[in-house]
């Protein structure tokens, strides 16, 4: 999918009456003003490096694609991309000259260089979207390398057996080895290889590796049964997510990419918060988003972090 992003964009209503507005600010639209409700005001962003608006390519998994967040777009439809995902907001906020979003739900590091089968089609290798003309790349990947969906299924199911214990932690650390930490370690060289491939395919691009926002509360033992993760498993899974983000930060620094920390800004917006505050939905979403995935507020929050990183 290749989209040309207009430099003159009207206000667009979002969930719960919030408004995203992007419109050309100065000559030729080379700078753009973006105002997101809930921020301190409009911010001005220039192009990320080379003169003129960026040629932007978005790579990633479901946290990038924003499944079920309105409006779903693109091909193959099974990738579940939203027009309100953070890449779309970043494209508007930078006044991107061209914008290509090839993110896809379920993507792993392997799908940067290998096709991905999804319902209703196949997503080509995501790196195919890159070229020497590309000047901005965002990548968000590795959650599926550690088995994000399986973790959710196991941990929510096991919470019913011992809601005040740590059945999920016990499952993943049985035998004396933390299987999730091992998967994080195994993913590190694969993320590094993806970044190296991006630099090879898009030698003129600034590359940003985007981390994952808070899912479970940053302190305490969660909110079972509202979100069915056992009390003792919340600190464990919180540590797993922090370890994943730490790995991404280290790999980014070692491979000429800028790490975008979305975790810190999302503290206080976890799945246990009320609708209108939480950035990530729980097992039973209260707004249009996939379970345990960012809603529209979460995508806006991640967009702000990426735009801030662009400087």
PLM feature segments, named:
Residues 1-44:
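Secretory targeting and sorting signals
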Residues 41-55, 121-138, 191-206, 307:
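Short amphipathic alpha-helices and their capping/turn segments at secondary-structure boundaries
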Residues 44-106, 128, 156-162:
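Serine-esterase "nucleophile elbow" of acetyl-processing enzymes
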Residues 55-60, 64-66, 98-103, 135-140, ...:
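Structural recognition of the beta-strand scaffold that forms the well-ordered cores
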Residues 67, 120-183, 214:
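Oxyanion-hole/transition-state-stabilizing segment in secreted/luminal serine hydrolases
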Residues 106-124, 271-286:
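Charged, often glycine-rich, active-site loop that binds/positions anionic groups
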Residues 136-137, 162-201, 208-251, 255-259:
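Conserved N-terminal glycine/acidic-rich loop preference
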Residues 213-311:
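Catalytic His-Asp segment of secreted/periplasmic serine-dependent ester chemistry enzymes
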């Amino acid at each position: 999918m290749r989209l040309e992003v207009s430099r003159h964009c009207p206000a667009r209503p979002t969930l719960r009456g919030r408004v995203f507005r992007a419109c050309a600010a100065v000559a030729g639209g080379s700078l753009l003003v973006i105002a997101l409700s809930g921020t301190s005001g409009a911010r001005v962003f220039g192009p990320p490096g080379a003169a003129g608006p960026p040629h932007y390519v978005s790579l990633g998994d479901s946290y990038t694609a924003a499944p079920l967040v309105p409006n779903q777009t693109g091909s193959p439809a099974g990738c579940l991309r939203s027009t309100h995902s953070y890449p779309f907001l970043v494209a508007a906020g930078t006044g991107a000259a061209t914008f290509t979003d090839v993110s896809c739900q379920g993507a792993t590091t392997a799908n940067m260089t290998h096709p991905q089968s999804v319902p209703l089609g196949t997503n080509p290798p995501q790196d195919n979207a890159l070229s020497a003309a590309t000047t901005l790349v965002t990548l968000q990947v590795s959650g599926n390398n550690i088995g994000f969906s399986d973790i959710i299924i196991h941990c929510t199911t096991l919470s019913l057996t011992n809601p005040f214990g740590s059945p999920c932690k016990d499952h993943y650390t049985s035998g004396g080895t933390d299987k999730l930490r091992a998967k994080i370690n195994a993913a590190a060289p694969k993320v590094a290889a993806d970044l190296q491939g991006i630099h090879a395919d898009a030698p003129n691009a600034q590359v940003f590796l985007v981390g994952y926002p808070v899912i479970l509360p940053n302190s305490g033992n969660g909110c079972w049964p509202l979100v069915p993760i056992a009390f003792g498993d919340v600190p464990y899974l919180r540590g797993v997510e922090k370890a994943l983000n730490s790995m991404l930060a280290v790999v980014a620094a070692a491979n000429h990419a800028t790490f975008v920390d979305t975790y810190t800004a999302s503290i206080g917006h976890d799945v246990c918060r009320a609708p209108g505050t939480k950035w990530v939905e729980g097992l039973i979403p209260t707004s249009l988003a996939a379970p345990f995935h960012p809603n529209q507020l979460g995508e806006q929050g991640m967009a702000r972090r990426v735009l801030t990183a662009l400087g």
